[in-house]
């Protein structure tokens, strides 16, 4: 898989990531992944600023996909242990997988939650079931943060890394776009790439999100740093300037020279090592 080869290739070549910024601001940084990646990829994630890396074995998973509450409960335990030993703030990236494909079999069929209506495609129904479970678990997680750590401020940013496969049943023509990706690249403005992000605060007032819709993902780390009130690096400030100049677009920014110049400055300043 080219994605995994890229992680190994880029190990040690990124000098300014969001977790690295967090480290500079005194944060402990942790990553909870759903995969069995500790042996292969812990080096990459540590190289971009994660102090601790918990793969599926470290988290005690017993099956491919656990309910979201499993990973949230692990975080609550990790943070409770951290807070007992240190007053440092903590930045954590948590992966979840319960809403992921495949949808041909019910996930935790004993759990009764809303799905689709009578005429809903079976896979769409299953996806909606899992989204209902995910929404319940997420709200419960926020409530646990609120009650378990009264007065502790949290900024919780959630986002989807890709669209669910069931979109092929919901949007005519999208399946053809997705199936053609390997044969012919599709434009970055395609619906096939659109997902979501959201920010919630616990004992923390979240500033207004950028007005741009869509917002390309290369801007998200700088947006998170700004929402959290962190000091912004020169590169982060430039990303936010480009966000405004390009109206939220990055790959399809009309000012291509500005994007290329930004990439060149990242390389020339050794923020990204190109050799």
Question: What are these model-predicted stretches?
Answer:
Residues 1-275:
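Solvent-exposed soluble domains appended to multi-pass membrane proteins
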């Amino acid at each position: 898989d080219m994605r995994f080869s890229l992680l190994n290739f880029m190990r040690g070549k990124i000098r300014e990531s969001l977790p690295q910024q967090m480290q500079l601001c005194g944060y402990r940084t942790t990553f909870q992944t759903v995969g069995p990646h500790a042996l292969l990829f812990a080096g990459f994630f540590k190289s971009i600023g994660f102090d601790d890396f918990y793969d599926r074995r470290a988290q005690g998973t017993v099956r491919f996909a656990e309910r979201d509450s499993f990973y949230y409960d692990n975080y609550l335990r990790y943070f409770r242990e951290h807070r007992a030993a240190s007053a440092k703030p903590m930045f954590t990236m948590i992966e979840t997988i319960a809403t992921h494909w495949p949808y041909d079999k019910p996930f935790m069929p004993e759990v009764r939650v809303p799905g689709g209506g009578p005429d809903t495609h079976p896979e769409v129904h299953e996806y909606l079931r899992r989204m209902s479970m995910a929404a319940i678990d997420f709200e419960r997680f926020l409530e646990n943060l609120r009650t378990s750590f009264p007065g502790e401020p949290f900024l919780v940013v959630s986002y989807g890394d890709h669209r669910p496969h069931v979109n092929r049943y919901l949007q005519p023509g999208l399946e053809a776009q997705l199936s053609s990706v390997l044969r012919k690249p599709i434009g970055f403005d395609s619906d096939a790439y659109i997902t979501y992000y959201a920010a919630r605060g616990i004992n923390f007032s979240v500033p207004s999100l950028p007005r741009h819709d869509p917002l390309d993902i290369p801007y998200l780390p700088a947006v998170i740093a700004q929402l959290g009130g962190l000091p912004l690096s020169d590169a982060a400030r430039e990303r936010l300037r480009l966000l405004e100049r390009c109206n939220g677009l990055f790959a399809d920014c009309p000012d291509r020279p500005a994007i290329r110049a930004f990439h060149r400055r990242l390389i020339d300043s050794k923020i990204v090592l190109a050799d």
